Design a protein with these regions (language model features):
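Conserved catalytic-site region of short-chain dehydrogenase/reductase
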Residues: 78, 113-127, 142-148, 160, ...
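Active-site Tyr-X1-5-Lys
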Residues: 140-171, 194-200
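NAD(P)H-binding glycine-rich loop region in Rossmannoid oxidoreductase-like domains
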Residues: 49-93, 105
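N-terminal Rossmann NAD(P)H-binding glycine-rich loop of SDR-like oxidoreductase domains
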Residues: 4-23
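Conserved Rossmann-fold NAD(P)-dependent oxidoreductase catalytic core, especially the SDR/UDP-sugar
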Residues: 97-140, 166
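C-terminal substrate-binding subdomain of Rossmann-fold SDR/epimerase-dehydratase oxidoreductases
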Residues: 129, 198-322
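Short-chain dehydrogenase/reductase
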Residues: 89, 93, 139-151, 183-191, ...
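Flexible, glycine-rich beta-alpha linker
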Residues: 120-121, 142, 166-188, 213
Length: 322
């Protein structure tokens, strides 16, 4: 039996990965997260609640597992990265140190690190290939730097100690599971925008000109990609862009969300707020490597995925107001 430790398994992407693993009887799943695991997860998985920054807790969580998928990190929207730069750098680095050491100590068969598209914050090649990570200038944001540091940690642990690693870089994750925050920019853009539209905001506020581009990737597609990379012999010591392929402007994404919330297309209007010091102008990855080596590609279209997310969030917000 393949026993997989999913760190950060109670998060939005983590929960999608756990659901994907539980759908395959060949996987036994252990989740480690300081957040409360939902009931379905507690009923289906072994749940560990220790602080993985502590080496003894990371070791306890990893013991008996053959595979690790490392998602535990401080994440969020662009405002969160600017609000907590030292905290997220410190926490994420401590997690790398303890969790990777535990993986080495317990001789896991595969350590899969879930990185971020933010390592390509200053990319100059489009569509951006995995190989471009070595030519891309160092990220300016603390978050981008911290996720790049995790990739360096994996490769260093392999070079010195033989860590069997795989790196996955999700791009612009969205889907049911993430609630918006009262402060704009703390959560990711999609739940933030859905909440604004459902609340009746008009004109709809976005950060920046709206010409910035993103590649929205549904969490279920990301989960499939991460598990495919972890499971495949071809994924060993490789890195993969885990992303949809359609490049959309933020303004186009806002319009898709507006119409998915049943607002009149003729009334669509944007208000442009000042953007942040670091805001990625363009994000468009090359996804051919994952398709070629793993047989994986994103399957959920943006209109379908956004409609699903709107329905989920509408139900949660209605329940909260009841």
């Amino acid at each position: 039996m393949t026993r997989v430790l999913v760190t950060g398994g109670a998060g939005t992407i983590g929960a999608a990965v756990v659901r994907r693993l539980l759908g395959d009887p060949s996987f036994d799943v252990r989740v480690s997260d300081q957040r409360a695991a939902p009931q379905w997860m507690r009923e289906s998985c072994e749940v560990h609640t220790g602080d993985l920054r502590l080496h003894e807790q990371a070791s306890e969580a990893t013991k008996g597992c053959t595979h690790v998928i490392h998602l535990a990190a401080i994440v969020g929207g662009i405002a969160n990265f600017h609000k907590l730069p030292h905290t997220l750098t410190s926490v994420n680095s401590a997690l790398y140190d303890a969790v990777i050491q535990a993986a080495l100590d317990h001789d896991v068969e595969r350590f899969t690190y879930v990185s971020s598209s933010m390592v390509f914050e200053r990319a100059t090649e489009y569509p951006t290939t995995e190989e471009h990570v070595f030519q891309t200038p160092m990220p300016r944001s603390a978050y981008g730097f911290s996720k790049m540091a995790g990739e360096v940690w994996c490769r260093a642990a392999h070079d010195e100690h033989g860590l069997p690693y795989t790196i996955c870089r999700p791009f612009n994750a969205y889907g049911p599971g993430e609630m918006p925050d009262d402060e704009p920019g703390i959560a990711h853009a999609v739940p933030d925008l859905i909440r604004k539209v459902l609340s009746g905001q008009h004109p709809l506020q976005i950060f920046g000109s709206g010409a910035q581009t993103r590649t929205l990737t549904h969490i279920d597609d990301i989960a499939d990609g991460v598990v495919a990379a972890m499971s495949s012999p071809a994924g060993l010591h490789e890195d993969f862009n885990i992303s949809a392929s359609e490049e959309l402007t933020v303004a186009e994404i806002a319009r898709i969300i507006w119409e998915a919330c049943d607002r009149d297309p003729a009334e669509f209007e944007l208000e442009h707020l000042p953007t942040f010091t670091v805001d990625v102008v363009r994000r468009w990855p090359d996804v051919s490597k994952a398709k070629r080596m793993l047989g994986w590609e994103a399957r959920i279209g943006v209109h379908e995925g956004v409609a699903q997310t709107v329905q989920w969030l509408r139900e949660r917000l209605a329940a909260a107001d009841a």
